[in-house]
Amino acid sequence: MIPYAAGVIVPLALTFLVQKSKKEKKRGVVVDVGGEPGYAIRNHRFTEPVSSHWEHISTLPELFEISCNAHSDRVFLGTRKLISREIETSEDGKTFEKLHLGDYEWLTFGKTLEAVCDFASGLVQIGHKTEERVAIFADTREEWFISLQGCFRRNVTVVTIYSSLGEEALCHSLNETEVTTVICGSKELKKLMDISQQLETVKRVICMDDEFPSDVNSNWMATSFTDVQKLGRENPVDPNFPLSADVAVIMYTSGSTGLPKGVMMTHGNVLATVSAVMTIVPDLGKRDIYMAYLPLAHILELAAESVMATIGSAIGYGSPLTLTDTSNKIKKGTKGDVTALKPTIMTAVPAILDRVRDGVRKKVDAKGGLSKKLFDFAYARRLSAINGSWFGAWGLEKLLWDVLVFRKIRAVLGGQIRYLLSGGAPLSGDTQRFINICVGAPIGQGYGLTETCAGGTFSEFEDTSVGRVGAPLPCSFVKLVDWAEGGYLTSDKPMPRGEIVIGGSNITLGYFKNEEKTKEVYKVDEKGMRWFYTGDIGRFHPDGCLEIIDRKKDIVKLQHGEYVSLGKVEAALSISPYVENIMVHADSFYSYCVALVVASQHTVEGWASKQGIDFANFEELCTKEQAVKEVYASLVKAAKQSRLEKFEIPAKIKLLASPWTPESGLVTAALKLKRDVIRREFSEDLTKLYA
């Protein structure tokens, strides 16, 4: 009897001790700071914000050159060879471009430095002056990175612009910064040509593709990226390294409200974030391979690639449209980018991780029977273990489930992922756990903004908690200040709450030519530290980790005085398998909220087929009362799982068939909702929901 009792008591005791040690570990500690009174936390390992991880290095081009020389013969930048393009026509007459891609072809660190030096010299030879600005307007690719480093080497400020930006925002960005040279792909060059008469200062265009339209504006000097490099190789120019305080990048936000704002980042700002991130992922180094596919015009991707370049890791370039074996642009039988690259590290925005989760669940549900039961059982066993229970699947049993169930799922992302970095928006706890178990890798949730150069907080490698964004990065102090109007106070129990304010060497200079907005959200305290007021609401856990709980702008007061956090409700409802995207809308003149739901075509059509419901197309199905009721019931279930209040659950919904994409203008390039645009686009539907 004693062995059996021990078999129960020992695991329980170990579970208690492990969970207790996790709770007791201090990841952030309280710190006394200047400025507006509040509750401030710093990283537990650093008493002051870190500016540079390297002595005597204060700018990005210095760091890049040292890294390239140190890792000269190692592979660095990889691009897949394009074998062929094909046009396929679907049954409804729509055409789709499909790509047949080969293996990755690599540049070493040494060859990349040569390419950067050649481009920097070529930039001078075509007439670009140091005091003029360059804009990079293209999808993420190796030429983007080389262009950026080439400009840094000549102390030229780079204006970054999303390739999905609309005409009005594109004109605004280029004209406001008085850009004289634009570096772009052939696709983006066509966009520039359409608005050429509205561009006031552009003189030169460098096309990353050797083949580009011949009818370029006659007032522009148009040349290929290859020719600029050739010109620089034949006429080398000495570097003109910047100072730490010089502006490296003017990064235009993706503009979820109104025209995009240009955030001015110094070399010191970016270097501080790079230095801080270096301390987070253990054993980060030469053996790692990074999958680069998010927009380099987004600070999350730019910072991540800067870190990889510094530590000697390889970077393989891809695209969201060719990422996996089943991606939209991948020709059947061709490997997706992750399968070809087999990366060890990836960044992802929550929307992409949600799609991975939904895709796996759809396949499991479609198989049904024994396969589904096996998956559900294995998942439950691993979930118990990852939540700290010694009665979950550990050791040999974990290995068994990995081999039998999860190995094929891991292959979706190449099979070698050891760390995922999520940022740009809140990640649901459900998705985080699902990816943890099925991909077999921890997800580091980060919190930062363009204005903080991506710096803010980051969850540590061994922190398996969900719903939090970690402790302050070594480059930042994070402070909560009272927002009395919204009912969030630093004196709240059991955890202090308030608006999140970030300070440190990563805080940017402000908005380009927008002093009024800069003064509104940037403050300098009596100690000289710069702070940014984020507009997000958070709370600190006892271990010093931050949790995002609201956003000031997304909170609406209903007719009877209740407050609804739109973002919080959307995050809760998005776990429904029927939801592709969702926007909750609340009108203060009513006592309830409503929602626009972009339905998941695969899931809703699958349900309708099982129910024997006839429909001519998906658009018609979304108007059927049975479909609306089914989706609504799923939303209510998700709301109850997340313990939403009754007034937070949308009373009525409208099902939409067409997806919201950056091209549609309804979401940003980072897939964030453009609420004002969506409200205008669907104003009639919203009015009917309140009728």
Swiss-Prot record:
Entry keyword annotation includes Ligase: yes
Highest taxon above the source species: Eukaryota
Cofactor: Mg(2+)
Pfam family, one: AMP-binding
One term under GO cellular component: chloroplast
Expression sites by tissue: Highly expressed in developing seeds and young rosette leaves.
A GO molecular-function annotation: ATP binding
Functional pathway: Lipid metabolism; fatty acid metabolism
Protein name: Long chain acyl-CoA synthetase 9, chloroplastic
Originating gene: LACS9
